[in-house]
């Protein structure tokens, strides 16, 4: 039995997806956001350093503009995300303030982390904010990101973005909150006998092949992008927990070593009972 030990974890990146922030009705899940702010603030009070990678701009924008479906037109998608990003950050700021925690916004595009000078600048920004006891809230800059062959500036989705941020900031742990319990050996929505994988030490071709499917109507991420994110984390000698975000307080249980979700950690670094 692999024993999870997170006592030495100081810097944590938490990624929350749109499906965890927006209710099936399209309305904002205020209770979930409040719980998340409480948990992060509690961790900060214990001396942890937390960076939040938050999707949700599109979901917030759809709610504000009273649009039932995600636009298919790119320009309209960018407009909706732009409106939603402001609303999302406003809400985060209000709720975190209730717990005496200050937040900041960092919007990234892929080219920022590709070029050395801009990468150094954004790294310094993260370090400065963290040193001030501020929670950086990161999202992709959807209003200006493009995905064209000659000038691709999109990360693809925030699963990959969270892995990039974990690498940039040299985080001790990436916690990815989703609408699933973790990585299963097969699709649990199809197979009743699907088993949750408690620990993954190597991302095999079998695991990659078993991952697939799209995200929700509000988001873009699927299981494959989470597996690819785990690969990126491994490349940076990091570790990741993929878990259900239904109850953000479960983050505290994970950090206590409870075996929730799927723990991605290379086997040579695993401590045995």
UniProtKB/Swiss-Prot annotation:
<dbReference type="GO" id="GO:0055129">
    <property type="term" value="P:L-proline biosynthetic process"/>
</dbReference>
<dbReference type="GO" id="GO:0005829">
    <property type="term" value="C:cytosol"/>
</dbReference>
<feature type="binding site">
    <location>
        <position position="142"/>
    </location>
    <ligand>
        <name>substrate</name>
    </ligand>
</feature>
<dbReference type="InterPro" id="IPR036393">
    <property type="entry name" value="AceGlu_kinase-like_sf"/>
</dbReference>
<keyword id="KW-0067">ATP-binding</keyword>
<feature type="binding site">
    <location>
        <position position="15"/>
    </location>
    <ligand>
        <name>ATP</name>
    </ligand>
</feature>
<keyword id="KW-0028">Amino-acid biosynthesis</keyword>
<dbReference type="InterPro" id="IPR011529">
    <property type="entry name" value="Glu_5kinase"/>
</dbReference>
<dbReference type="Pfam" id="PF00696">
    <property type="entry name" value="AA_kinase"/>
</dbReference>
<comment type="function">
    <text>Catalyzes the transfer of a phosphate group to glutamate to form L-glutamate 5-phosphate.</text>
</comment>
<dbReference type="InterPro" id="IPR041739">
    <property type="entry name" value="G5K_ProB"/>
</dbReference>
<keyword id="KW-0547">Nucleotide-binding</keyword>
<feature type="binding site">
    <location>
        <position position="55"/>
    </location>
    <ligand>
        <name>substrate</name>
    </ligand>
</feature>
<dbReference type="InterPro" id="IPR019797">
    <property type="entry name" value="Glutamate_5-kinase_CS"/>
</dbReference>
<keyword id="KW-0808">Transferase</keyword>
<dbReference type="InterPro" id="IPR001048">
    <property type="entry name" value="Asp/Glu/Uridylate_kinase"/>
</dbReference>
<keyword id="KW-0418">Kinase</keyword>
<feature type="binding site">
    <location>
        <begin position="178"/>
        <end position="179"/>
    </location>
    <ligand>
        <name>ATP</name>
    </ligand>
</feature>
<dbReference type="GO" id="GO:0005524">
    <property type="term" value="F:ATP binding"/>
</dbReference>
<keyword id="KW-0641">Proline biosynthesis</keyword>
<feature type="binding site">
    <location>
        <begin position="220"/>
        <end position="226"/>
    </location>
    <ligand>
        <name>ATP</name>
    </ligand>
</feature>
<protein>
    <recommendedName>
        <fullName>Glutamate 5-kinase</fullName>
        <ecNumber>2.7.2.11</ecNumber>
    </recommendedName>
</protein>
<dbReference type="InterPro" id="IPR005715">
    <property type="entry name" value="Glu_5kinase/COase_Synthase"/>
</dbReference>
<keyword id="KW-0963">Cytoplasm</keyword>
<comment type="similarity">
    <text>Belongs to the glutamate 5-kinase family.</text>
</comment>
<dbReference type="InterPro" id="IPR001057">
    <property type="entry name" value="Glu/AcGlu_kinase"/>
</dbReference>
<comment type="pathway">
    <text>Amino-acid biosynthesis; L-proline biosynthesis; L-glutamate 5-semialdehyde from L-glutamate: step 1/2.</text>
</comment>
<feature type="binding site">
    <location>
        <position position="158"/>
    </location>
    <ligand>
        <name>substrate</name>
    </ligand>
</feature>
<dbReference type="GO" id="GO:0004349">
    <property type="term" value="F:glutamate 5-kinase activity"/>
</dbReference>
């Amino acid at each position: 039995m692999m024993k999870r030990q997170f006592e030495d974890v100081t810097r944590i990146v938490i990624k929350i997806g749109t499906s965890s922030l927006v209710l099936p009705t399209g309305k904002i899940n205020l209770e979930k956001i409040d719980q998340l702010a409480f948990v992060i603030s509690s961790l900060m009070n214990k001396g942890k350093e937390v960076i939040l990678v938050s999707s949700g701009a599109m979901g917030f924008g759809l709610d504000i503009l009273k649009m039932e479906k995600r636009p298919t037109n790119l320009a309209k998608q960018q407009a909706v995300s732009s409106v939603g990003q402001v609303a999302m950050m406003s809400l985060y700021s209000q709720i975190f303030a209730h717990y005496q925690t200050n937040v900041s916004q960092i919007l990234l595009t892929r080219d920022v982390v590709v070029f050395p000078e801009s990468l150094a600048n954004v790294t310094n920004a993260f370090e400065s904010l963290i040193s001030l006891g501020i929670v950086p809230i990161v999202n992709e800059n959807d209003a200006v990101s493009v995905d064209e062959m000659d000038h691709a500036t999109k990360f693809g989705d925030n699963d990959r973005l969270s892995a990039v941020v974990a690498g940039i900031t040299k985080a001790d742990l990436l916690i990815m909150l989703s609408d699933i319990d973790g990585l299963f050996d097969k699709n649990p929505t199809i197979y009743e006998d699907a088993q949750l994988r408690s620990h993954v030490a190597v991302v095999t071709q079998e695991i990659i092949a078993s991952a697939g499917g799209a995200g929700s109507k509000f988001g873009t991420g699927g299981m494959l992008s989470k597996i690819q994110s785990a690969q990126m984390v491994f490349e940076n000698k990091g570790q990741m927990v993929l878990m259900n975000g239904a109850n953000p307080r479960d983050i505290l249980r994970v950090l206590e070593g409870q075996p929730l979700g799927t723990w991605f950690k290379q086997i040579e670094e695993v401590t045995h009972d």
